[in-house]
Amino acid sequence: MSKRTRRKRLPEPVSGITIESLSHDGRGVAHLDGKAVFIDGALPGEVVSFEYRATRRRFDEGRVTAVMQASPVRVQPRCPHFGLCGGCSLQHMESAAQISAKQQTLLDNLKHIGKVVPQTVLPVLTGPVWGYRTKGRLGVKDVIKKGRVL
C-alpha cells in the first residue's frame, strides 16, 4: 500500500515587506524571519504584500499581490501578457534601470563566480527598447509516409 504524501500548507500572505535587492533572474529579494524570500513582480525599495508560492529549507518564493509603496523606476508594463508568460520578467522596470541591474548582475557574477574584477567597464550598447525581438524559430518535420508536414 502506498503512502499518501500531504502537500505542505503554505504560510499566510505577508503585508508590508520591504524589497532589498533584485535577484539574477529579476525577482525581488527580501528577508523574513532570517530566510530569503524571492518575490515575482517586486522591485528594490518597494514595500509590497505577497503570497507564498513555495517554501523551501533555505529560501521561500512568492508573488506580489499589492504594491503599497512603488519604486521610482516602476513603469506600466506594455505587454498585455506581462506576468503570465515569463518572457519579459523586468518589463515593469524602466529600461535604464533594467540595464543597470543586468550590468550589476554581470559584475557580481564575475566577482563571485569568476574571481575577476574588471578594471574598467565599457558603456552598455543599447538599441530600441521595444520591438527588437522579431526572430521566430519553428520546428518542422516532413512525414513522407503520411504526405504531410508537421
Where are the regions that the model predicts?
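Non-catalytic accessory regions of SAM-dependent methyltransferases
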Residues: 1-150
